Each structure stands twice: as C-alpha cells, then as structure tokens.
C-alpha cells in the first residue's frame, strides 16, 4: 500500500487512475482506502523528513500558492532556502497575518532563526514577519530577521511551486481540508527526496519514502 501512496504523491495521478494502475499490477485498492493511508502516514513521514533533512542555508524565500479544497481556494504557505531546498510548508484556510505568523513560527521551530527572509509585496506576510521579530527582540534571542520584499528574488520559491502544482493538478481538488493537508505533506516530502535533501543518494526514492513511515 505504501507503494501506492508514494506513486500517488510523487507522480500526480487521480485516485481513480491509481486504482487502475495498481489493478494492472494485481493489487486491489480502492481510493477510499488509499486516502486513509495517506492521512494515516502523513504526520510521521513529514516529521521524520524534517528530522533527517540536511542543513539548509540561513537566507530564505517564502511565498504561498493556491490549492482548491471543497471547491474553494486555500493557501499553501511554503519556504525554501536560497539554494531551493525545502524548509517548511503549511496549508491554511485564510491568507492573512495570523496565518503568515503561524507559518513563520513553524518554519523557525524546525529550522532555527534565519538571517533574512525574502517575501513578496504582501502586507499580511510583512506584518506576520514583523510580529515574529517583535517576539525575537523581547525574548532575547539575539537575532532579528532581515526582511526583504522582492518579487524578483522570490523566483526560486515560485519556480519550486511548479512541481507541487504539477502533482496536485491531476488530483482535481480535495474533498476535505485534513486530507488535503496530509496529501500535501507527503507530496512535499517526495519532493524533498527528489531534491536529495535526505542525504541518501544511491538509495531509491521509494525506499527512502517507506523508511520515513517507520
């Protein structure tokens, strides 16, 4: 079943198409069962990937992209470093200061405090990051994050969005927020493996993915 999950989040097919692909290989799996497996393993796989990923640079690029859930747009917040290595991701129902602040706290929690973050011209992202700097200042962390607003410098993360969107497009949207978040976590993890972020060159991507499931 983990092979089906990996195939789904790595290559971008619909649940129905994956049923047919697996049936051709003699494996009987329905889309409801596959969805349960995606949701079941997502937290563990994503957490283990974060724990095992190689060190990243202290200059970040942050942006968000749109994901359709229940026929409505939600927002996938994403950050990569200057080399395009994935740092963190978070699906949110709203694109506002609170969501941006929550994302920055989460990214810092898993990657430490960066020297600077490049964002777009979004006022919500700016306000969210400024509020993080206030917290850093008054907690005595010793480093205030440099803020750069530049669409041009954010090309790295915008280009990185394309891989995620290429995988999600054939999925034709998600029916529930929690399953969307779980699926995206595994898509991001498969993307990290593809970029070699787990430092296991020579090991097949599927084996790396299965190892993260425990």
Regions inferred by a protein language model and the residue ranges of each:
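Residue-level recognition of single "structural anchor" positions
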Residues: 1-214
